[in-house]
Amino acid sequence: MRWLVGGGLLLAMLAFGIGVYHAAGYFKADHVVVHRPNEISGPTLTGTIYVVQSGAVYRFEHGSFTQITSEDGWMQPASGPSGQLVVVRRQNNFSDLYLLSTSGRKLGQLTHNASSASVESNHWSFYPRFTPDAGTYFFASDQKDPYNSYLVDLAIYALDASSGRAVQWTSPNEFTGGDANPVPLRGGGLLYTKYSIDDSFKVHSQIWVQKRQGSAGQALTTSELGCAQPALSPDQKLIAMVCTKGSNLSAELEVASFDSTTLAMGSPATLVGGQMVASPSFSPDGATIAYLAPASPGGHFQLWTVGSSGPASARAITRDLGLDSTSAPVWVGG
């Protein structure tokens, strides 16, 4: 019970801090009205982009947003087979993965993480990604220690779409929150974000790659760069990632060449600096990267695009939304 009390106090402190932050921002600057995406329009982009705001998934095409789900805890959509979407639905004490149509209709529930025994036995699933052949989907999930249920370190799992059998791919470092952002490779390997903790109890993030399930893998970036949230171009020759480089005030969008055969990565180059960048995603032709970032320091997250080859100017697609920064845009053709 002690950890429950401590957790409650921590949440209360966090809520208080967020309230103070927003109150201070209200008096320091003009109060910004956050619109629902379907209340605004934007420039026309090729293809279709899915984004998330306030627990609802929106489809952006031909310069307009359409809400396809209710505001009911939906987050982190990913493209699935036959144009479908696999989406996380987060509830108070667990989350599950669902298969949705492009209009938001439920086609199936892929995980069942709510326990009938106790809240401590519930599980979380996040960051779904299908393999290029759509035969397997990867996701991050926790397997709680029954004697230490407060330990929630996510590992990456692969679930066979036909058999429904899941196998654990990665072994997370304890007390870091675990592994995240799986990106399956055509050759059968896996890119993801791995977190570690040093002797000063500081958590570091690195882009990590594994050739096969259960292997130790290797780091593609140093812990000093603080890189996370990898995204691959459709031809799997470019990696986009977010790197903090030790800063708590900014996160840069970096891009590097990648050889999916040798698993070698080139030196990262900065595409976007001076912003709090999050959740990059490539366009279907690989020429453009969509990402999320505030339009001004402390602001809400907006949708941006930038050319993947650089140097190029970032383009703001929205100005007054409040997009979910943990839900990467899903950019598909059509």
For each of these PLM feature ranges, what is it?
Residues 2-334:
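Sequence signature of WD/YWTD-type beta-propeller architectures
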